[in-house]
Amino acid sequence: MMKRRDVIGAAAGLIGSVWVRPATADADELAAAVAAFAGGAPVRAGRVEFDIAPLVENGNTVPVTVRVPSPMTEADHVTTIAIFNQRNPQRDVANFSLGPRAGRATVSTRIRLAGSQQLVAVAKMNDGACWSRTIDVLVTLAACVEP
């Protein structure tokens, strides 16, 4: 005969296992999204400057700037800058296409963050090389939270 205590404990465990996603799944999904963007090219750390506050009070509108020092000439320029996140419902936050006429490889926007997480900015160069910068951001009031 099952006791009430056993039923309640089993139900709580089942609910917890459905609602809680392991952090490794988020990290694996983030790495997979970055790798898919790179298209098989190795993603190396460096060359990307990623400006975002390390502590964000409200995740609903977070200013972000990504810069890549590049001469932006026909022979050497940034073709794409992408921003990825670890915990939002979709891993790709933004994707910007650039060319030599852009003059500077700098993009600014505002994003939403679903809690404290890791962000990755990746720059793809015209020769196929990919450079990245990873930043951890603490968010006190989350956005993008699924019910």
Q: Where are the language model's segments positioned?
A:
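Short acidic/polar inter-strand loop motif in beta-rich domains
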Residues: 126-132
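Transition segment at domain starts
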Residues: 24-59, 96-97
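Extracellular Ig-like/FN3 beta-sandwich strand-entry sites
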Residues: 114-118
